Amino acid sequence: MKLMVKIALLTCGAEWSGVYHEIEKAAQKVGGELIFPEVDLSYIDEVEDRLGFKVGSANLKLMFARAMSIIEGNTDAEAVFIATCFRCAEGALVRNEVRKLIQQNTNLPVVMYSFTERTKASELLTRMEALTTIVERKSLLARKKQEGISLGIDSGSTTTKAVVMIDDEVAGTGWIYTKDVIESAKEAVNNALKEAGISLDQVETIGTTGYGRYTVGEYFKADLIQEELTVNSKGAAYLADKQEGEATVIDIGGMDNKAISLYDAIPDGFTMGGICAGASGRFFEITARRLGVSLQELGELAAKGDWRKIKMNSYCIVFGIQDLVTALAEGAKAEDVAAAAAHSVAEQVFEQQLQEVDVRDPVILVGGSSLLKGLVIAMEEVLGRKIIVPRYSQLIGAVGAALLSSGYRYKKMKA
């Protein structure tokens, strides 16, 4: 019988807002059991000064005391979930300080969340699954180098990517639009194998991730089938050579995007967009089509243009495109329109996603859209900081899957 992962819940307001039961439901669904570090009033008063600033909320004082109890080894917690209300600025400050203290003084994985009164278990599943994965595969996620010959497959909603790695180097890649999940994976894999100059029989380990990971994993008899949050984080940190310390990953995909805060290449904060495609790669595809250029050409145009010359009244993919078309009809230059599209995406990611995570340097931009030069410039301007775009930035999921799956090599060799 599989043992439940013990997750210490540090929260303020989850009980009275009705969110606690949703957190509990999400934890149970992925094999987690919530526990509460026990502290008494005298202990709360004793440790309060260690926070470094005065806290008004009694619930936040309790949350901090429970965190200190974890640090002092008074619980059998295997992971920590920190959650505070999105309306509370004091809560956000304490949440981040608690996160830092736990990471600096323990080896426990931490995931943070800012909840609303309407938060449902379905919204928490990805975070809870990542948390239990980190506990159950801790030694695997500590892997910093790929060994042998491994294949990683990222079966996404828009594109399917495959990467062959040989002795810590990317040897072959495959990238195609997703149609049929299995057929798309087979084609991407064949392209990667061909470029690497090997056959599937020579591959020692296989890892899958992405929306179609279970279907593709079953077909290829994968050694590793893992959710994309931990896999993408590992792939991005590995490619950027930032596997130690803090970092932020911004992943702009075909239909959605993610902002992930990392500590030692493991995610501890995460938000996903997807309600509006106006901040995704799809927006760039439509803009490029309107301008009659390729995506790469769109990126080059955007790098030369001035977004300030184009008036955009909406981030929406429909109305945003209408604004760009109107500007073209009025004689606007193509490069200015391209720059406006890039700036629109950068602003939307900043305003709607990066407000929900702790943005830490270095910032790593990945996903297919990271290859657009104009978007990189726009992101640096909006964020006011330097952006890292590693080689193979569009293939982080497949690279992460190949890297992590190689951890099963010795186990298979001994079998």
UniProtKB/Swiss-Prot annotation:
It comes from Methanocaldococcus jannaschii (strain ATCC 43067 / DSM 2661 / JAL-1 / JCM 10045 / NBRC 100440). GO terms for molecular function: 4 iron, 4 sulfur cluster binding; metal ion binding. Gene3D superfamilies: 3.30.420.40. Binds 1 [4Fe-4S] cluster per dimer. The keyword Signal does not apply. The keyword Iron-sulfur applies. Its cofactor is [4Fe-4S] cluster. Homodimer. Pfam families: BcrAD_BadFG. [4Fe-4S] cluster binds at C276, C316. This is Uncharacterized protein MJ0800. Keywords: 4Fe-4S, Iron, Iron-sulfur, Metal-binding. Signal peptide: none annotated.
